[in-house]
């Protein structure tokens, strides 16, 4: 069952990335009148500064949080897609570590999918998004701060990836370079 869900989620995220890419580039979805222009262009989440930009691998949403529910028939349905600032994975990772320590027999008895490589894969996907012409790149996790509801997530992932956790006030721009 999970293999089918996994394939569907991968397909869904690819479709969402292609949709976003079309909105900011070819705009075929508007020409074909699939989606009204005003619906997108009047959205507070539409960034006209992104028009004409084409991120590497057309990956507008490098991280996606898809909320699934199970209906009364036992079918899984997508409740919502979180593409802007998905959060929650750190709680799952932390929970899995605790569960493995407390109930190791469950992990040997059942085929529990491994999640221990998540932070490494996230780090690698971030590296792959760095433009090739960048000299001496540095990655950070940018957080609004300790009062943000996703702060645990930000600090956990920064620690797991071995990169700095910074707030906007920790950064400054000089001669078109960002410094910490």
Residue ranges of predicted features:
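Domain-scale recognition of functional cores that engage charged ligands
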Residues: 1-180
């Amino acid at each position: 069952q999970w293999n089918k869900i996994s394939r569907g989620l991968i397909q869904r995220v690819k479709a969402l990335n292609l949709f976003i890419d079309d909105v900011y580039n070819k705009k075929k979805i508007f020409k074909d009148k699939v989606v009204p222009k005003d619906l997108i262009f009047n959205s507070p989440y539409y960034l006209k500064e992104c028009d004409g930009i084409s991120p590497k691998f057309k990956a507008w949403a490098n991280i996606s949080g898809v909320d699934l529910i199970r209906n009364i028939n036992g079918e899984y349905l997508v409740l919502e897609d979180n593409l802007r600032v998905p959060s929650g994975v750190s709680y799952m990772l932390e929970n899995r570590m605790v569960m493995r320590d407390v109930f190791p027999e469950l992990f040997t008895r059942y085929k529990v999918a491994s999640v221990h490589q998540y932070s490494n894969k996230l780090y690698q996907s971030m590296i792959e998004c760095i433009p090739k012409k960048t000299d001496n790149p540095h990655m950070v996790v940018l957080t609004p701060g300790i009062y943000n509801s996703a702060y645990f997530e930000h600090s956990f992932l920064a620690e797991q990836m071995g990169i700095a956790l910074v707030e906007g006030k920790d950064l400054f721009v000089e001669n078109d370079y960002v410094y910490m």
